[in-house]
């Protein structure tokens, strides 16, 4: 074929043999100028074809059977292959070096759970952009990679989650480590990530019970350059309440979540998550599975055809957001209305719905709307947030572009609670945080009030709210003799943009005897 060159590829496994097709299925040629990748289907380690002249990354994955059973995996990686004439390339897995992740704690091992607790990603500059070119789960089978480079932007990134003896649950500590194995634009001859505990953020983490026996687990995954998805590995915390020392590589963005269920099978559960960055080594404190829970910062959008994508995480805490409906053991509904009460549309999920605004009249500007949501939760792992009722008001008009954000107000709470999410029957300070869409600046609040109930919302009394150097704060004195009772909260907020929220949260937290 004119304008192309013949390419012959021969692959060898770690025993120096041509692998069976099932053990090495394809070879990838990725043009360094960013053009489309070309795949070649291997036939027992061999393929021939033709490619345009140029410079390519060449890679293949090779499984080698072990005499004792199982297989090893080798990523054979060539960071720069010049195709300027007919050529043959031999991809030899015997050149692979073992990848490993470790810390300076002798009993710390990669977890043996799903995915194996370790992950490797290769990134390289392709077409002027940092690009993920290969990724591998370190799942317990021996894993190797061939040294390569130097090449612009080339890096082998390793991430691991390590526990005591690799325990999948119940370890008193969890290491979350991530980083490049070299700073020289190469895949080195020793592709290992070695981390000292003193170099990490030490995060003392408290997991609270929510009024009922419960079990929890967590995922953590680092953000990588080069695009692609974040890979998080699971570790079980065990029965609650519990405290754990969790170590994190500082300076990296981590996606973390907590899964809370009635037992450690977690077949039904509530999930909250957040993105965290610990800027430097040192000691930090954080809380998980802590109330009050309620509507968090939204993800609402308005499309130019008038579609409102109403997406509010309904069981968020001060420091972590829940997912979106549907939720386990939760029922409810959401309704969009005009300002005069005419129902536009209704969904059968709390905090969630795709609605269409009415066609605007000629010359009309923004119109006023109201969204109401109700959520009812009967979760065997939690007595918190058993009922929510929220009214939002806002004004909107169809955007001239494809879409625009539709940020609404919410108020989240933080207060000192014990390991069962209970407050003392004494003076109590409650921090209030008015929030809106996570990509929007903080709202400027014109008015904020709080009411409190000790009988599940049958009666309410006002609580004084003030703005201090630390933000909005309310002070209440909980009544004595409230054993087994719960505190419910009702907040009203209005900002300078004219948006309002009136939100009722039944069972925000419990009271101590």
For each feature predicted by the language model, list its residue ranges.
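Low-complexity, acidic Ser/Thr/Pro-rich "mucin-like" tracts of secreted and single-pass surface proteins
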Residues: 1-513
């Amino acid at each position: 074929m004119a304008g192309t060159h013949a390419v012959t590829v021969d692959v060898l496994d770690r025993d120096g043999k041509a692998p069976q097709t099932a053990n090495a299925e394809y070879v990838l040629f990725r043009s360094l100028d960013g053009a489309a990748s070309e795949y070649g289907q291997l036939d027992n380690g061999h393929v021939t074809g033709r490619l345009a002249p140029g410079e390519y990354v060449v890679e293949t994955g090779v499984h080698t059977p072990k005499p004792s059973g199982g297989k090893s995996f080798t990523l054979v990686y060539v960071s720069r292959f010049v195709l300027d004439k007919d050529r043959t390339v031999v991809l030899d897995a015997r050149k692979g070096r073992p990848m490993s992740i470790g810390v300076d704690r002798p009993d710390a091992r990669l977890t043996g759970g799903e995915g194996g607790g370790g992950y490797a990603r290769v990134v390289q500059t392709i077409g002027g952009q940092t690009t993920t070119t290969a990724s591998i789960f370190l799942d317990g089978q021996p894993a190797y990679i061939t040294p390569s480079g130097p090449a612009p932007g080339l890096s082998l990134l390793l991430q691991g989650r390590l526990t005591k003896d690799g325990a999948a649950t119940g370890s008193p500590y969890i290491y979350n480590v991530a980083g490049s194995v070299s700073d020289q634009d190469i895949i080195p001859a020793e592709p290992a990530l070695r981390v000292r505990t003193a170099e990490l953020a030490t995060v003392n983490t408290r997991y609270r019970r929510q009024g009922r026996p419960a079990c929890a687990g967590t995922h953590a995954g680092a953000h990588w350059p080069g695009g692609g998805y974040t890979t998080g590995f699971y570790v079980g915390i065990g029965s609650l309440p519990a405290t754990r020392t969790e170590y994190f590589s500082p300076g990296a963005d981590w996606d973390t979540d907590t899964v809370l269920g009635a037992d450690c099978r977690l077949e039904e559960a509530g999930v909250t998550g957040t993105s965290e960055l610990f800027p430097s080594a040192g000691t930090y404190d954080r809380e998980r599975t802590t109330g009050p829970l309620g509507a968090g910062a939204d993800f609402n959008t308005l499309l130019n055809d008038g579609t409102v994508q109403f997406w509010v995480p309904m069981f968020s805490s001060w420091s972590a957001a829940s997912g979106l409906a549907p939720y386990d053991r939760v029922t409810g509904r959401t309704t969009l209305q005009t300002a005069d009460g005419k129902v536009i549309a209704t969904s059968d999920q709390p905090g969630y719905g795709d609605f269409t605004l009415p066609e605007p009249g000629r010359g009309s500007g923004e119109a006023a709307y109201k969204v109401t949501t109700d959520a009812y939760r009967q979760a065997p792992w939690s007595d918190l947030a058993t009922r929510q009722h929220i009214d939002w008001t806002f004004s909107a008009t169809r955007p001239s572009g494809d879409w625009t954000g539709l940020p609404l107000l919410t108020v989240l709470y933080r207060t000192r609670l014990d390991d069962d999410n209970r407050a003392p029957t004494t003076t109590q300070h409650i921090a209030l945080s008015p929030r809106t869409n996570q990509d929007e600046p903080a709202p400027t609040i014109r008015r904020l009030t709080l009411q409190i109930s000790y009988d599940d919302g049958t009666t309410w009394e006002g609580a004084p709210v003030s703005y201090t150097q630390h933000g909005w704060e309310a002070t209440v004195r909980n009544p004595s003799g409230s054993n087994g009772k719960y505190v419910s909260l009702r907040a009203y907020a209005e900002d300078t943009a004219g948006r309002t929220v009136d939100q009722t949260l039944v069972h925000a937290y419990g009271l101590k005897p």
